[in-house]
């Protein structure tokens, strides 16, 4: 079925910044998609088009991206009369019209908004759930429920505390189902709140952009200690492990790293990549840390390669790979990491996101689907992670509605699948083997 109408508008993300929403109409009805936005962004990401008009929304308006959709993309797609099930064809049309390497003409936020809406319309056209349509597009005969990696302590660019490392996560990989993983995550989260309140006072339980707590601690080890205590108090030491997103590009300084980057600059405290790697190895030895994301700067290839080759844990590329097939191919060649963080807005279309995922999986990598810190109530990534069978998702703490929207959608999907539901569990790095 072809597209009858496309209308884009500015709406607000969870940080109160404008973002793009797209309404797409076919004979089957209205299909709506909204685009997220990141705070710690990799320099190689596709371009998110902002107006840069300082008199409006501090320059963060997206009226130009909206106009590109309404004035250029919409008429072109409607006149071409393409069927909404032809995702790759529609995405290619938009990419060809944009013509730039990084989607800087229309903006990745414009192209992605339409691409997501097309995908939802395609599922309705086929009369199947969105996750099934995505699985079909990716050539996956089965679907898998992911282990949720709840980001329960926030630092880095997501929080106003001194903590350098951005996310401390608790994936309940020992759960038997997604529903049980949610319960475990929520119970650990509430235990963590009490542990933090007792140690640092009630104001330390204020939450960051992704719903995690942001106590004013400086030592990253202290965050791990808090998690270990909370997991133990909740009674889940055998079922919950720890993941981290260091976002090291945020504190990379002249070939070294500044673990106190939110204080006044002092080069004497910078540490070398080797010293940082030793710190991580200490974490892995003393805590159940099974996954570390962006342990080094996005261009510090040597440090990545050396670290990944020396540890048995999951090493996730985010700023390093930016969901871009070219960067992923280089990281595969260099053996720089062993897991891809998949963010649809880093690359800017559904088709390219699927290509990035399949490239990583075909090289033996794990894949983790991810939200952004500036989110909306859109739940597309919940269906995406199930259809792509990646086995892991991070979309914040079990707190703040824009985060729970995704987790709740996953609960519904598991319920709908009934006895056919498969949960990745401890095989989250390679969920298809069990």
From Swiss-Prot:
Any one GO molecular function term: magnesium ion binding
Enzyme Commission number: 4.2.1.11
Location of the active site: 210 (proton donor), 343 (proton acceptor)
Cofactor (UniProt): Mg(2+)
Residues annotated as binding substrate: 158, 167, 293, 318, 370-373, 394
Pathway field: Carbohydrate degradation; glycolysis; pyruvate from D-glyceraldehyde 3-phosphate: step 4/5
Record-listed Mg(2+) 2 binding positions: 245, 293, 318
Catalytic activity from the UniProt record: (2R)-2-phosphoglycerate = phosphoenolpyruvate + H2O
Top-rank taxon: Eukaryota
UniProt binding sites for Mg(2+) 1: 40
Enzyme class: lyase
A family per Pfam: Enolase_N
Subcellular location: Cytoplasm
GO cellular component: phosphopyruvate hydratase complex
Main subcellular location: cytoplasm
Protein family membership: Belongs to the enolase family.
NCBIfam families: eno (TIGR01060)
Assembly with partners or alone: Homodimer.
PANTHER family assigned to the protein according to its UniProt record, in alphabetical order: ALPHA-ENOLASE, ENOLASE
Protein role: Both an enzyme and a lens structural protein.
Matching HAMAP family: Enolase
Record-given protein name: Alpha-enolase
Species of the source: Anas platyrhynchos (Mallard)
Gene from which the chain derives: ENO1
